[in-house]
Amino acid sequence: MTTRQQMKSEFVGTALKKSPLSRNQIAAVSGLSNAYIRELEKGGIGNVGREKLIAFAIALNLSLTEIDDMLRVFDRAALAEDDIPVFIQASERSRISAALHPIRDSFTFDIAILSAERIPGDHVIVSPRPASCLRAEGHRAYAEKSLAAAHRLYADLVEAINRERRKQLMANLADHAVRQFVCINCLTDYIRECTDAEEKRWRQRHVRNAVNIISSFERYEFYLTRECPSFIFVMRTPPPDSGISEKLIITVLPPHRLQVRTSGLLAGFATDNHAVILNFKEELTFIRESIIEDYLDRQKLIDFLVELSD
């Protein structure tokens, strides 16, 4: 084994050992076979495609800086704007498995959600605010400016993923329902308790963007609830005849958080485990019972959201 092969082998071996995922999970998320990953670990592949390296790095939960390190070890240039489509394409190959898959970093979490959102089917969102993909262009870059400052690609990458998620949302609404459940107190605090003037303007635009979707798409059902859910989660339910299992993405958002400052924090989990999904369906049953009936009237709902965002 040459020195260069040894470096590649050691880098991949260390990354695999640090990963909380099994080999099968890494293969499922990256779209690479176990056999290919074993050859990478041995340093036995002389010319590894850039796209495969990035997909592998995403599955390993590497930060953007760590992905740069991997690319350099494999004699590739650091990440650049031209690589953004590769991250988007990685969401097409990624598969969510029955194991509980931990996800670190906002951009990796977004890719996991996008991979689920690409599957046609009914969509449930339980959160304290409108769907994150409805944030205006530039909001992510501001709210996560510390991460944007840490890596030159970060802001453009998360905005590009957000655009693709909005595109998938619109496409899905053509044939399937999207049901969002939002705690009215959390949503009110999201706007009124924000002390950062610029962030508040971004949040107001976020709510107005939700109003535009509610006004334009009958299949977008937005419910205000009295109860604050235990978890924030997204559930995708493909048609029964599709043969595709339901997908679940879980996260917890600290109510006081304004700026995301640290890379590497646990962002959430993804799974298609039936038993886990059944528990969240039971949670959804309780959430439905707390829907505020006054705002089932679509115009009253819109009026409330417009007033809140002014």
Predicted feature descriptions by range:
Residues K18-Q25, G49-R50, A80:
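Short, charged amphipathic recognition helices of the HTH superfamily
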Residues M1-S22:
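A short, Lys/Arg-rich alpha-helix, primarily the initiator
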Residues E51-I54, I58-L100:
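Short amphipathic recognition helices of helix-turn-helix/homeodomain-type DNA-binding modules
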